[in-house]
Amino acid sequence: MAAAATMAAAARELVLRAGASDVEEEEGPLGGGSGLQEPLQLGELDITSDEFILDEVDVHIQANLEDELVKEALKTGVDLRHYSKQVELELQQIEQKSIRDYIQESENIASLHNQITACDAVLERMEQMLGAFQSDLSSISSEIRTLQEQSGAMNIRLRNRQAVRGKLGELVDGLVVPSALVTAILEAPVTEPRFLEQLQELDAKAAAVREQEAMGTAACADVRGVLDRLRVKAVTKIREFILQKIYSFRKPMTNYQIPQAALLKYRFFYQFLLGNERATAKEIRDEYVETLSKIYLSYYRSYVGRLMKVQYEEVAEKDDLMGVEDTAKKGFFSKPSLRSRNTIFTLGTRGTVISPAELEAPILVPHTAQRGEQRYPFEALFRSQHYALLDNSCREYLFICEFFIVSGPAAHDLFHAVMGRTLSMTLKHLESYLADCYDAIAVFLCIHIVLRFRNIAAKRDVPALDRYWEQVLALLWPRFELILEMNVQSVRSTDPQRLGGLDTRPHYITRRYAEFSSALVSINQTIPNERTLQLLGQLQVEVENFVLRVAAEFSSRKEQLVFLINNYDMMLGVLMERAADDSKEVESFQQLLNARTQEFIEELLSPPFGGLVAFVKEAEALIERGQAERLRGEEARVTQLIRGFGSSWKASVESLSQDVMRSFTNFRNGTSIIQGALTQLIQLYHRFHRVLSQPQLRALPARAELINIHHLMVELKKHKPNF
């Protein structure tokens, strides 16, 4: 409709302008249609406003020309005036139709107006109702807030009353003394369970009353008297019971572990005394310390004394040293020596005392051993004595910590109050024994027993014996070192000329050393100690020097080598039975044995084959220096060597084998030496063959008499000893 109206207006405007234009054309330029041109008196013209109006018209026309309907009308060549009238007619028809429609719907419109008016009235009433409801809600909200505040205050008062009630209930329960408690404390024996239960209740009430009294609670005065009387009664009964148990320790042949177990069952008794009657608790502790310290001292003094009676009667003395000759003590007034002095240098089965099975074996019973006429070395007695000490000390320490409720330094002090006198007595006895002890193996075994017992005590979490173990080791180590140094000095000062007749067999001093060293090395391997290895190293040096001094007494080098080899082989064999193959002692004697064996083989081959050895060495030296031509003058010597070897080698080898087997006590060592000698002989003859293959000696007629090297090897194998 708007577009049509716009187009109609535009059409009317165009029609008007077109009409004006036509009129002007009809009138012509002269007006009136006369065709004459009359000058116009227009005066001063102001065309500014007209130009502005034309501009607006142009813009309006241009805008209308953009309309689709106008474009379509212009395109089809429609007469705008006719089209404008048609449009105007249509607009009038539409207007009239609209008026008719409005008149037809006037009743509906009036009804709609009435309905709208009624709705406005209803909405107004609802607005009033909602306003009243909002006002009511505001008042209700304030009432709810008031109720919430009142409820919170009531909750706080309730919680406060409940808290007060709970504390008052606890206070009353803690202060009230029930009749069951009174009856149990006064009438029940201390061994009954209900006495212990009510004693714990009494302890709790006494603690509660003390706490409340500190805070100024007046109600405590009402029950203080009753609780004090009950406490005194309970303390009296507990004191009598515990002292009775302590006195039972004093009965002869009493197994004090039984009363200790009974005391542990009622350990709360002492806890009660400690919290309610410290004077009585101290009295009981002092009585326990005094009683048990005397019992332990008496028991161990008796046990150690009876234990020493089953020691071997024959013990090492100051003259039983490694370097002391067997004939030194034989005199008119001298005591008979040990059945065999060598036994004090031999470990034998003594080392089993530090094995796990023997270490914690039951202790020795002296009277049983005496009835069976059994005797033991000192280390076995030491093990039994200290295992009993370890076992009882561990049990005592744990009992003290649990029953007397102590730990740390306090537990150590209480333990030493009980066991201190016993430990001191044991140390004095050990010190007295060691002052006259010359058995190094026994002392060394005792050291290792202590090291193992110290580990056991640590595993049992009993540190109270740590200082005692250190004191024992402080006695054992210096004595062990002193005995070892005495043996070193005895070997150093031994004069070979005073040892009697010379013999190439192993010397008894070297045998003592081998047994002694292997014993200490095998023990030391379990818990290595560098100081022990140093002392053994000093002893080894002195023994090696001693062997060389004795060997120097032989007139021939061959006898010297036989003596050295026999002694080195014996010492090496004994050491390898107990010590590790890679120990310093084994490696050292292995090197010495190999060196002397090689020298002996050369000495052994020298008489029968010395000429051959000398020629081969000279010839190889000439060949190496490039002077092989000088071998041409040795034909006669070579011929003699070939024929001499061919005629005598079998007899020489036979004599050599017999000589070796006579010289060496160890058949295996003798066999090894023979094998080494035959091997070296084959190598020597093979080298002789290589020398004769030189051009200067290749044409020698005597080469035909050479023994085939393979034939020689086959023949020499026949002389290999079989054991």
From Swiss-Prot:
Organism of derivation: Mus musculus (Mouse)
GO cellular component, one term: postsynapse
Pfam families: Vps52_C, Vps52_CC
Keyword Aminoacyl-tRNA synthetase: no
Function: Acts as a component of the GARP complex that is involved in retrograde transport from early and late endosomes to the trans-Golgi network (TGN). The GARP complex is required for the maintenance of the cycling of mannose 6-phosphate receptors between the TGN and endosomes, this cycling is necessary for proper lysosomal sorting of acid hydrolases such as CTSD. Acts as a component of the EARP complex that is involved in endocytic recycling. The EARP complex associates with Rab4-positive endosomes and promotes recycling of internalized transferrin receptor (TFRC) to the plasma membrane.
Source domain of life: Eukaryota
Entry's Gene Ontology BP terms: ectodermal cell differentiation; embryonic ectodermal digestive tract development; endocytic recycling; lysosomal transport; protein targeting; protein transport; vesicle-mediated cholesterol transport
Parts forming coiled coils: 107-127, 194-214
Subcellular location: Golgi apparatus, trans-Golgi network membrane; Endosome membrane; Recycling endosome
Single GO term (MF): syntaxin binding
Complex formation: Component of the Golgi-associated retrograde protein (GARP) complex, also called VFT (VPS fifty-three) complex, composed of VPS51, VPS52, VPS53 and VPS54. Component of the endosome-associated retrograde protein (EARP) complex, composed of VPS51, VPS52, VPS53 and VPS50/Syndetin. EIPR1 interacts with both EARP and GARP complexes and mediates the recruitment of the GARP complex to the trans-Golgi network. Interacts with RAB6A and STX10. Interacts with BLTP3B.
Modification sites for N-acetylalanine: A2
Name of protein: Vacuolar protein sorting-associated protein 52 homolog
Keyword Transmembrane annotated: no
Modified residues (Phosphoserine): S355
Family, per entry: Belongs to the VPS52 family.
Keywords per UniProt: Acetylation, Coiled coil, Endosome, Golgi apparatus, Membrane, Phosphoprotein, Protein transport, Transport
Membrane-protein topology: Peripheral membrane protein
InterPro entries hit by this protein: Vps52, Vps52_C, Vps52_CC
